Amino acid sequence: EYRGKVKKLDYRLGVGVTRSYYKQSGDDSYENYSFNPRLVLHYTLPGNSFVRWKSDISNASPSLGDLSAVEQIVDSLQIRRGNPNLKAYLRYHTELTYEWQKGIFYSNLWGAYDYQPNAIMDEKYQDGDKIVQTWDNQKDWQKLSGRLTLRVGPIKDMLQFSFTGGVNHYMSHGNTYSHTYTNWYCNAEASFNYKQFSLYWQMNTNWNNFWGETLSGGENIQVLVMYYTHKNLRVGLGAFNPFTDNYKQQTENWNKYASYKKTNYVK
């Protein structure tokens, strides 16, 4: 890694090398080398603020489980089968951050773009009277992300509030499918400290991920915790979702042959 500075601009340039090798009994081996460059530019602005740009390229390799051609029975209609022809692929990531702080006020604005051509993602197809679940190097997977964080505090070393709101937009392009999905989310926190007592509250909405044809849902939760500290002793009492009863976590698959939707509730 090389670091340097030109006036208010700091920069870092690095590169790594990754070797991927795998071989299964009775199959040909596969070996792949990839260069993983990364670049960071940090520009200091007037006051306590800056702009930072980061970009990197990394590689991803298939797991041995994904490569195995052994069939596993899922149910009476579906089987799971690996793909020994999977290849490693590259992941491109870039992000831009603006941060500002003055006194007890703080803000952070962040955006990112991810691009993964030939990404290894799930797919299903019909083979006779069975639905085959497998993996393949698909066309590409893309993600656009944005996030804003605002914070106030600590006020008189006792009270602090923060709020984060963001969005993830997924574009999953397979060899036989194409899906888009947008997820809005937020997070809020508040803390209060007085002498030996501390009170903390946190709220998260669902942060969902979409990969291939599968949506993996996050949790919408609230947490309330109270602490008492005396010297090296800390005693706490917490509650999960104390003010709501709408906990929900869901998983979906959007395949045209065998879609499903699972939802977990806590009452």
Label the model's feature ranges:
Residues Y2-G4, V17, L39-Y43, L86, ...:
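Residues on the lipid-exposed face of transmembrane beta-strands in outer-membrane beta-barrel proteins
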Residues G47, N59-N108, Y115, Q133-S145, ...:
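Outer-membrane beta-barrel signature, preferentially recognizing the C-terminal barrel domain
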